[in-house]
Regions:
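Active-site beta->alpha N-cap acidic-glycine motif
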Residues: 1-85, 95-103, 107-110, 185
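Active-site beta-loop-alpha junctions enriched in small/polar residues
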Residues: 24, 49-51, 75, 116-118, ...
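Soluble catalytic domains of enzymes that build or remodel membrane lipids, polysaccharides, and related
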Residues: 90-96, 127
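Catalytic grooves of carbohydrate-active enzymes
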Residues: 164-201
Length: 201
């Protein structure tokens, strides 16, 4: 993956954790997540689709204002290997999000990309790299993505803390009420174990 500027974890010899959130739509849990990050002075990356920028512009601006990375999760959440047949279609999935972000914030979107559903091919990775992106996968994810079927607070916290390791990239979903409720405690417990939270490298 290195040849395509793609990675799924950070430095495995450093007690560092990278928080990342995928944002497909807003259901009221992102602001409590931002509140917890602010209270505990922890940075994160938010991978947003085009629809999210359209429908939650003030939250996106808050992410930027509070020092987080807002990065690209495509415009329509397509499986990117399925659109490699057309360079124009493929590129537009990323550049449309860049344009929306620039129009909203006046800033260039950071060149980090998370492929929808984690799906990729050698060709899609190469095409993403050609646009100047690093592709960011993850070393941990769990079943937090169904709002109507959320893990309990105990299950969510235990699942995350039991799987921490040096260089962890955590994939969490911002639609998860469990994540919003436990995030502050997770940050505190991780720090007690010697971890610190950094922005993506």
């Amino acid at each position: 993956m290195k040849e395509y500027d793609a990675y799924y974890m950070g430095n495995a010899e450093s007690k560092v954790i990278y928080l990342t959130f995928d944002c497909g739509y807003e259901n009221g849990n992102t602001e409590p997540i931002l509140d917890a990050l602010k209270k505990h002075n922890a940075p994160a990356a938010f991978f947003v689709v085009g629809h999210y920028i359209n429908t939650a512009p003030e939250i996106v601006k808050r992410m930027v204002d509070e020092g987080h990375i807002v990065a690209n999760h495509t415009n329509h959440h397509y499986s990117m290997p399925s659109v490699t047949y057309s360079t124009d279609v493929f590129n537009k999935e990323l550049t449309d999000v860049e344009d929306k972000f620039k129009e909203l914030t006046g800033k260039d979107m950071p060149k980090f990309f998370r492929p929808p559903m984690g799906q990729y091919s050698q060709k899609s990775l190469a095409m993403t790299k050609d646009l100047g992106y690093k592709t960011v996968f993850w070393s941990f994810a769990y079943g937090d993505y169904e709002p109507s079927n959320q893990p309990s607070l105990y299950e969510g916290k235990k699942n995350i803390l039991d799987h921490l390791h040096d260089g962890s990239i955590l994939l969490l979903h911002a639609i998860s009420k469990t994540n919003a409720d436990i995030l502050g405690e997770v940050i505190d417990e991780a720090r007690k174990s010697g971890y610190e939270f950094y922005l993506l490298p």
